[in-house]
Swiss-Prot record:
Keywords: Cell membrane, Coiled coil, Malaria, Membrane, Repeat, Secreted, Signal. Not glycosylated. It is found in: Cell membrane; Parasitophorous vacuole lumen; Secreted. The gene is MSP9. Its main location: membrane. Residues 512-521 have a biased composition (Low complexity). Residues 211-224 have a biased composition (Polar residues). This is Merozoite surface protein 9. Forms a complex composed of MSP1, MSP6, MSP7, MSP9 and MSP3; within the complex, MSP6 and MSP9 mediate the binding to the host erythrocyte. Interacts with MSP1 subunits p19 and p42; the interaction is direct. Interacts with host SLC4A1/Band 3 protein (via the 5ABC region). MSP1 subunits p19 or p42, and MSP9 form a co-ligand complex that interacts with host SLC4A1/Band 3 protein. Residues 459-473, 672-722 have a biased composition (Basic and acidic residues). GO terms for cellular component: extracellular region; nucleus; plasma membrane. It comes from Plasmodium falciparum (isolate Camp / Malaysia). It is a peripheral membrane protein. The lineage of its organism: Eukaryota, Sar, Alveolata, Apicomplexa, Aconoidasida. Residues 226-273 are annotated as: 8 X 6 AA tandem repeats of [VT]-N-D-[ED]-[ED]-D.
Length: 743
C-alpha cells in the first residue's frame, strides 16, 4: 500500500511538472521592468496598493485597518485590474528581477558581472584544492610512484591539473584589466557590454576543466589497480566541481538574472567554503554581517538601525579589494612560473613522466596554500563589492525620488532623516530591503534545517512507545549541533532554537523562501496572524520542482523517525534550481494528503517546542535557585562588608579617642616640662657660676702661691746675700788680727 502511494504521488508530481515546463516561456521569463526599480514613485505605489489590498497576494497577511487605506484604494482601483501589477508584486516579493526586453539584450548589469567573477574564482579555488589533494596523495605514496613512474595515473592527473591551473593563471594575467574594471566599477544603472568577456571568463574555468577531467577519468579507468582511495576522492571532487560549475553556467546563461538570487548564491557558496573556518568574517560593506544578524536582526525588522547600515556602506569610496587583487596577480605570476618549470614535458609521451620532479611538489604546495589564502580574500572583497552595489541601487532610487519631489515643489534638496526612512520603509519597502540586505538569513536557516533534520536516507523503524520520552529529550541538544557546557549558554541556545523553530515553522507551512518580516520574538507582542511575505497558492502560472518522496509520514512513528521524515519532506518541498526555473517564483501546490502531512509535522514541531519550553522552565527554575543562592551569598557579603565597616568605624573612633587623650595629656604635661627645663637651665647656670668661682679661687690661690714662692725666693736670696756678706766680713777680720799680732 505504501509503495502504491509513492507511485501515485510520483505520477502526480510528474504531470504537474510537465504542465509547468510546457507553459509559455515568455510568461515564465517576464519579470519586473527596470523602470519600476529606477522609479521610486511607481515602486512605492505598488507597495502602498499591496499594503492596503484586501485580496492581497501576500499569503497570511491580515486585512489592514489603516484609515488612509480608503484613499489609497481609490488610487489603486485601476492598477489592481491590471495583470502587470500582480506580476510585478509577485517578482518584487520574490526578489528584484530585470525584464527581458530588447533594450538590454546582450548586456549584463554590474551585479551579474560580479556574480560571474565570483563563480570563476570559485572554480579556480576548487581546482587548487583538487591539485593540493593530488600532491598529498603523491607524497604519501612516493615509494610506489618511483617504482612505477612512467605509467602512473596519479602523476598523469596531477600534471593535467597543473596544466589547467597554469592556463587559468595565464588567462588571469592576460585579462588583468577586466578584473580591475570589475573590482573598481561604480554602482549605477548603466549596463556594460562585456558579455563576451564574461563568457570567456566562465569558459576558461569550466569548459576546459570538463574536457580534461573526462580524459582523466578514461585514463584512470585503465589503471584501476594502481589507483588508490585518495585518487578516487580527487576524481569525485573534480566531478562535483563540474556539476556545480555546469549549474552556475546554466544559471548565468539565462536571459535575465535575479539580483537577490545572485546575492543568495554567493552567500551560500561562501558559507559552504568557509563552513569550518571561524576566522572568516563576512561583511556587508563595512558592517560585519554576523554582528548585524546577532544584534540588530530583530530591531532591523521594525526599521531601527536599517539606514545606519546603508549610510555606513555608502560612506565608502573607491574600489574594494585593490590590494587583494594586486597580491592575487603577483602570487599568480609566481605560481605560473613554478608550474611552467614542472610541466615542460610533453604529455603525449607517457615515458616523459620519468623526469617528473617530485621534489619540487613541496614548494608548489606551499605556494598553492598562500595563493588560496589570497584568493579567499579577493573573493570576500568581490562579495562585499556586490552587496555594496545592491545597497546603492536601493538607496539611489530613494534619494532620486526625494530630490524630484523637492524640485517639483520648489524646495531645496532635503536632508533625509532616519525617522523619514523608518516611516516609509515600514509600509512595505522594508520587505524588499531585507530581501537584499539579509539574504544571509537563508543560509542560516539551511544550516539549522540540516542540523535538525539529517539528510541520510534510512528505512522505517519500528514503533517503540516505551522510548518515546527519551529520544525527545535527547534530540534537543542535537538541534544546535553542539552541547554547551555552561547553563547560561544552554539557556541562550534554547532561546535561539525556539525562536528559529517558530521562524522555520512559518517557512514550512507557508512555503515561502523570503525572510520573515516579523520575527518570532516580536510576533508575540504584535499580531500573531502577521506572517511572512509570500505568494498565494492560486498562482498557477509559476513552475516548481519536487524531490521524490522516500516514505510517508506516520503519526505513530517514534520521534527520531518523525524528525528524519520531516527532513525528507523538507527536501521534497524545496524547489531545485535549473536552467528553466531558477529565476521564477517558487511556489508549492499542496494536495490534501500533503496538507495532512504538513499538519502532522506541525503538531510534532509544537510538541518539540513544548518540550523545549519545559526544559527552558526547568533551567530557569534552576538558574533562579542559583540566583537565590547568589543573592544570599551577596547579602552575606554585604552584611560582612557592613560589619567590617562598622568595626573599622569603631576602631577609628577608639583610635581617635586615644589620640585625643594622648594629645590632652601631652598638652597638660607641656607647662611642667617647661618649668623643669627652666630649673635645669638655672641649675646649669649655677653650676657654671660655681665652676667659674672655683676656677677663680684656684687661680687666686695659684697666684698667692706664686707670690709666696717669690717671697720665699727673695728671702732666700736675701739670706744668701747676708751670709755672703758675713763671710766676707769674717775673712776681713783675721787679716787685721794678723797684722796686729805681727806688730
Amino acid at each position: 500500500m505504501m509503495n502504491m502511494k509513492i507511485v501515485l504521488f510520483s505520477l502526480l508530481l510528474f504531470v504537474i511538472r510537465w504542465n509547468i515546463i510546457s507553459c509559455n516561456k515568455n510568461d515564465k521569463n517576464q519579470g519586473v521592468d527596470m523602470n519600476v526599480l529606477n522609479n521610486y514613485e511607481n515602486l512605492f505605489k505598488f507597495v502602498k496598493c499591496e499594503y492596503c489590498n484586501e485580496h492581497t497576494y501576500v499569503k497570511g497577511k491580515k486585512a489592514p485597518s489603516d484609515p488612509q487605506c480608503a484613499d489609497i484604494k481609490e488610487e489603486c482601483k485601476e492598477l489592481l485590474k491590471e495583470k502587470q501589477y500582480t506580476d510585478s508584486v509577485t517578482y518584487l516579493m520574490d526578489g528584484f528581477k530585470s525584464a527581458n526586453n530588447s533594450a538590454n539584450n546582450g548586456k549584463k548589469n554590474n551585479a551579474e558581472e560580479m556574480k560571474n567573477l565570483v563563480n570563476f574564482l570559485q572554480s579556480h579555488k576548487k581546482l587548487i584544492k583538487a591539485l593540493k589533494k593530488n600532491i598529498e596523495s603523491i607524497q604519501n605514496k612516493k615509494h610506489l610512484i618511483y617504482k612505477n613512474k612512467s605509467y602512473n595515473p596519479l602523476l598523469l592527473s596531477c600534471v593535467k591539473k597543473m596544466n589547467m591551473l597554469k592556463e587559468n593563471v595565464d588567462y588571469i594575467q592576460k585579462n588583468q584589466n577586466l578584473f580591475k574594471e570589475l573590482m573598481n566599477q561604480k554602482a549605477t544603472y548603466s549596463f556594460v557590454n562585456t558579455k563576451k568577456k564574461i563568457i570567456s571568463l566562465k569558459s576558461q574555468g569550466h569548459k576546459k576543466e570538463t574536457s580534461q577531467n573526462q580524459n582523466e577519468n578514461n585514463d584512470n579507468q585503465k589503471y584501476q589497480e594502481v589507483n588508490d582511495e585518495d585518487d578516487v576522492n580527487d576524481e569525485e571532487d573534480t566531478n562535483d566541481d563540474e556539476d556545480t560549475n555546469d549549474e552556475e553556467d546554466t544559471n548565468d546563461d539565462e536571459d535575465t538574472n535575479d539580483d537577490e538570487d545572485t546575492n543568495d548564491e554567493e552567500d551560500t557558496n561562501d558559507e559552504e567554503d568557509h563552513e569550518n573556518n571561524n576566522a572568516t568574517a563576512y561583511e556587508l560593506g563595512i558592517v560585519p554581517v554576523n554582528d548585524v544578524l546577532n544584534v540588530n536582526m530583530k530591531n532591523m525588522i521594525t526599521g531601527n538601525n536599517f539606514m545606519d547600515v546603508v549610510k555606513n556602506t555608502l560612506a565608502q569610496s573607491g574600489g574594494l579589494g585593490s590590494n587583494d587583487l594586486i597580491n592575487f596577480l603577483n602570487q599568480g605570476k609566481e605560481i605560473g612560473e613554478n608550474l611552467l618549470n614542472i610541466t615542460k614535458m610533453n604529455l603525449g609521451d607517457k615515458n616523459n613522466l620519468e623526469s617528473f620532479p617530485l621534489d619540487e611538489l613541496n614548494m608548489l604546495k606551499d605556494n598553492l596554500i598562500n595563493y588560496e589564502f589570497i584568493l579567499d580574500n579577493l573573493k570576500t572583497s568581490v562579495l562585499n563589492k556586490l552587496k555594496d552595489l545592491l545597497l546603492r541601487l536601493l538607496y539611489k532610487a530613494y534619494v532620486s525620488y526625494k530630490k524630484r519631489k523637492a524640485q517639483e515643489k520648489g524646495l531645496p534638496e532635503p536632508t533625509v532623516t532616519n525617522e523619514e526612512y523608518v516611516e516609509e520603509l515600514k509600509k512595505g519597502i522594508l520587505d524588499m530591503g531585507i530581501k537584499l540586505l539579509f539574504s544571509k538569513v537563508k543560509s542560516l536557516l539551511k544550516k539549522l534545517k540540516n542540523k535538525i533534520f539529517p539528510k541520510k536516507k534510512e528505512d522505517n523503524q519500528a514503533v517503540d512507545t516505551k522510548s518515546m520520552e527519551e529520544p525527545k529529550v535527547k534530540a534537543q541538544p542535537a538541534l544546535r549541533g553542539v552541547e554547551p557546557t555552561e547553563d547560561s549558554n544552554i539557556m541562550n541556545s534554547i532561546n535561539n532554537v525556539m525562536d528559529e523553530i517558530d521562524f522555520f515553522e512559518k517557512e514550512l507551512i507557508e512555503n515561502n523562501n523570503t525572510p520573515n518580516v516579523v520575527p518570532p520574538t516580536q510576533s508575540k507582542k504584535k499580531n500573531k496572524n502577521e506572517t511572512v511575505s509570500g505568494m498565494d497558492e492560486n498562482f498557477d502560472n509559476h513552475p516548481e520542482n519536487y524531490f521524490k518522496e522516500e516514505y510517508y509520514y506516520d503519526e505513530n512513528d517514534d520521534m527520531e523517525v518523525k524528525v528524519k521524515k520531516i527532513g525528507v519532506t523538507l527536501k521534497k518541498f524545496e524547489p531545485l534550481k535549473n536552467g528553466n526555473v531558477s529565476e521564477t517564483i517558487k511556489l508549492i501546490h499542496l494536495g490534501n494528503k500533503d496538507k495532512k502531512h504538513i499538519e502532522a509535522i506541525n503538531n510534532d514541531i509544537q510538541i518539540i517546542k513544548q518540550e523545549l519550553q519545559a526544559i527552558y522552565n526547568e533551567l530557569m527554575n534552576y538558574t533562579n535557585g542559583n540566583k537565590n543562592i547568589q543573592q544570599i551569598f551577596q547579602q552575606n557579603i554585604l552584611e560582612n562588608d557592613v560589619l567590617n565597616q562598622e568595626t573599622e568605624e569603631e576602631m577609628e573612633k577608639q583610635v581617635e579617642a586615644i589620640t585625643k587623650q594622648i594629645e590632652a595629656e601631652v598638652d597638660a604635661l607641656a607647662p611642667k616640662n617647661k618649668e623643669e627645663e627652666e630649673k635645669e637651665k638655672e641649675k646649669e647656670k649655677e653650676k657654671e657660676e660655681k665652676e667659674k668661682e672655683e676656677k677663680e679661687k684656684e687661680e687666686k690661690e695659684k697666684e698667692k702661691e706664686e707670690k709666696e714662692k717669690e717671697k720665699e725666693e727673695k728671702e732666700e736670696e736675701k739670706k744668701e746675700k747676708e751670709e755672703e756678706q758675713e763671710e766676707e766680713e769674717e775673712e776681713i777680720v783675721p787679716e787685721n788680727l794678723t797684722t796686729e799680732e805681727s806688730k
